[in-house]
Amino acid sequence: MNYGLTGLARAKARAKRWYHQLFKAIFGSRPVQWSKWVQNTYILHLEERTDRFHALNKELSKIKTTKGTLADEVTWFPALRDVEHWPAGEHIDEYSFEFHWAIDPDPWFYDHIDELADQTIDCSHAETAISLGHIRMWRQFLESDAEVAMFLEDDVYFDYQFEQKITSIFEKELPEDWDILYLGALPNYHGFTWDPHSKNLIRLYNGVWWMSSYVLTRSAAEKLLDNLPIVGPVDVWINYQFEYLNAYMTPGNLITQTGMTDSDNTYSFVQEYY
């Protein structure tokens, strides 16, 4: 999801990607022990988006692991499109203004909050499909014998220091009781709350968008599925789950959205209020 990447932000993302590609070419990288830390890697992918498949597969091939490259260790998970029917216990495709605003309390709405709070917003078809896609990936993870899994959307690229920083994070910095690790996220302007933790990690409490690059433990996936349905967009709902998840985040994205391809998502809150 490219929430927030429009105009100048998209141009900056493209420039940053070029910068990272240049530095990666200059300095190279060392193989990482990926399967030691993350046993399964899933990519939520619309099969007709062959442009994204080729771009991300090329990116993954640059990440060297002790088994080859990261491209050799991923599962391309088919995304849904234009879903009209799904189990009632999985997703509620409407949410209130207050449900979103509590995560990102934009002061622009203060004078009208009483009249806006209970207004209902319908999710876009894409938001529903994405939410259901993440649920299905979590379930497939739990059907495996893996203890840790990474989940990607198909429009991302890797920071040129990814290998160095991810090694430090998994070997030295993550506490034993972690549940979810964001390797890329978009902090919102008004609700982002966190504490410092270590050189490459912060402890996250609230206020991030994107579900395009994150890592879950098995117990975290179980907790998320136990707390279904997802209400509204998954990257809004997940913030409410931090109450029982030990959430961490890299303060500078190690994996970020490219801004290079057109988004297949429509953002219901943005369409309704901005």
What are these model-predicted stretches?
Residues 3-152, 156-274:
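An acidic/histidine-cluster motif and surrounding catalytic segment
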